Amino acid sequence: PENLGGFGKDFVTGMLATEKLGGAYSFAVSISAHTGIGTLPILYYGNEVQKQKYIPKLASGEWKASYCLTEPGSGSDANSGKTKAVLSDDGKHYHITGQKMWITNAGFADVFTVFAKIGDDENLTAFIVEKDFGDITINPEEKKMGIKGSSTCQVFFNNTKVPVENLLGERQGGFKIALNILNIGRIKLAGAAIGSCKRVIDHSINYANERLQFGRSISKYGAIKHKLAEQAIKVYASNAAVYRCSQNVDDAIAALVAGGMNKEKATLEGIRQFAAEAAILKVHGSEVLDYVVDEGVQIYGGMGYSAEAPMERAYRDARINRIFEGTNEINRMLIVDSLLKKAMKGELDLMGPAQEVAKELMSIPDFSAGSDDPFEQAHTQIKQFKKAVLMIAGSAAQKLMMQLSKEQEIVMNISDMIIELYVAESVLLRVEKLMKSENSSKISEQTDILNVYLYDAADQLNKYGKDALNSFADGDELKMMLMGLKRFTKQKPFNVKEARRRIASHLIAEGKYCY
């Protein structure tokens, strides 16, 4: 907020800034941890006195922030932390004792958001702890695979004396704070990954244009064009999904503020409403980044393995993103869990549409030619993809019921289908919007991106769907649903090679990512 030293801009603007900083390697990690998980707990959960004391100095950079949640025995199971907070006899202070690890910015942070359990409490409580409070030991910097320019240390709180007024939010409300801040961190990570991807693609294109083999630039060869096109297609898709969700969040915040909620609470609630999407974006964005840097190394060939070339650092730095903000496996579980919880609360009708799809399986397929309009065809394909997801998710939920959460392989199959569906639809919506607002001749390659993405998504959905169905169905039921899956993921013939070549040729001519 402007009254606390910020710019007061909307969520989309914040995401654009996050994307721009995303290509800054280790610095991106440091500043994201400071402005995100380090500062936001105080902004969103602090009382007015806490916000006035800390936020202006954090916003200006005078103070740097860190976030102390992870412990040696509590990673994904964050609420199992052992750090303790004991109230002093005079009731004026808490004495915090415990060990935190993998703490970003720990080496230079002035302020820590620390999670601990008071007495025998079941859930965590958050505290604002200043480095100057003393009795804090910062271990030497960790020797990491990547992001070597960022600070990552273990932090020990040795009976650290913290004023009671530095309790953040409510007692035992720390786990809720952690979850909500992680939702923000996930979508921000996806935005930063886009920035990293675009920088790597620029390097890939420039090297491919400059590197001569057999008397020609390697960018003229089909194998390299395929790699460049795939890098761009995946990043375009991630970009479409990230900014679709970001605008949805802004719209939700605006509606909540209009209804009388204050901006901080509205922001948290707006993002909470899209917790499943945040997990989708985090998984997809981090895995796209891994793909892009891997192909970047390959385009560079032997030089890509050299620490003197830009790909080596990009390759190492990218890997942490599949672990940050909850591992991708945990996030895949969260996607399905979030949707099932919404269904049980009546916020999402999952079983109704799933039952309609089940009825459709018994009917005769529609063999009509359909519309000639490419966007209408794409919308029809997305509708079919949705039927595939509903069929499998609905059947799995109905058949396995409470056991579904224990069948993690099936949950991950369903989650991967949901991710593919959400991202594919996002690409369609983005290209369609551009088609309506710009000269259609200017976005022909973006239409190619849409068509290639849908082509590949159909195969991916079919693969994930078959894996799931073969894991929980059998007999005639299995045969019927496999036929339905084939129907719902049917793909018309399409020359993907030429489409990728057109996409790559545009990238090569521009000398940079240009979509």
For each predicted feature, which ranges?
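Glycine-rich phosphate/cofactor-binding loops in nucleotide/flavin-utilizing enzymes
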Residues: 16, 37, 292, 303-375, ...
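Internal helix-loop-helix
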Residues: 2-52, 56-62, 103-111, 235, ...
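Charged, glycine-rich active-site and insertion segments that engage polyanionic ligands
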Residues: 270-303, 447-466
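C-terminal amphipathic alpha-helical interaction region
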Residues: 361-515
